């Protein structure tokens, strides 16, 4: 029986997060938004993930203004965001009142679909966000963080899918952020999950890093998947996703037709091609990110993590150490209970791998985040961590066994009080909650711009500014 396959376009979020460390500006998006809205996509993934942090930290943009702008220009297409469960859009666990408020404000400002995931596939870390999305009338799509390792059988993922369904999800996504899926594994996994929870639509998300993405998507559709994540061709391949146009063409005229017209992509493709050329010329897009690297199947490193690792090593003048760091990543992952590599665990494991290589002595220097991961502060790892390794890393520190957020008191009112002088919109407290220093810097720049102050010329000590 024929069924229309849903296509989610990632150009406005994950594609540029994977290729250029999330540096696409709202101004660069504006000329193409109206055209994207006319294509007929199931959804546009345009917000969440690292975009929030990047807007505030690097682009001097208000992420909420970006969301409202995209909503205004795309009234006919569902807008989608990536949400890290109890980690929200930040890198630690937040109290339930913060999680609920971020979900509420996201939907109020235009988000339709919230793709919620937990880096450890710990359902305890997802329930608050799922309930909040249900309450606000949003679509809660819960993502399974796909990875490989001794415990990660089809049965493991089926059991997790059942828990996701029981928690109130509206759909499920297989999120293969590290491009570890193979075509045959995709087929078996999709069949197993669809058989276990046939009532929930199943979306497929994979990256092109290892060169297998298009084959995986095709096998997944044939096995029963209902939707695909793709990227417009100039922002596809490499550490990004399968090209949208190629998948539309591959499924055209089959029982899995997407209903999209290939001719409609011409203007959009041309526009993003000019952006791609600009990014390459400026050095923002490293051509290495566009290459196929089958070693991803060995190193288990997601696209966004790979581009950020390369960026970090360049800044440290240690670019030649990339292969050593990539080889160290799976070893650190094994030591820390086989966490799937997705934010924030990808950053935690990646940074620890960098430290291990650069210092020349493994674990002689550990980040607080890595210690927290080993101590259970992010949830229960898929595999138990060796008690001797735990003692080596955290000493006699107490290990958290339950839901980490249960240790947290409500935060919102306290946070509002701390930034009362800076608040210009309800959402500002969420920026401050997730990125305190970055948000304060942004608030100050915003205030200065409104009163005509150039922060570079302001003498803060004497509170003097030249006219």
Range-by-range predicted roles:
Residues 236-258:
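C-terminal helical cap(s) of enzyme catalytic domains, especially alpha/beta-barrels
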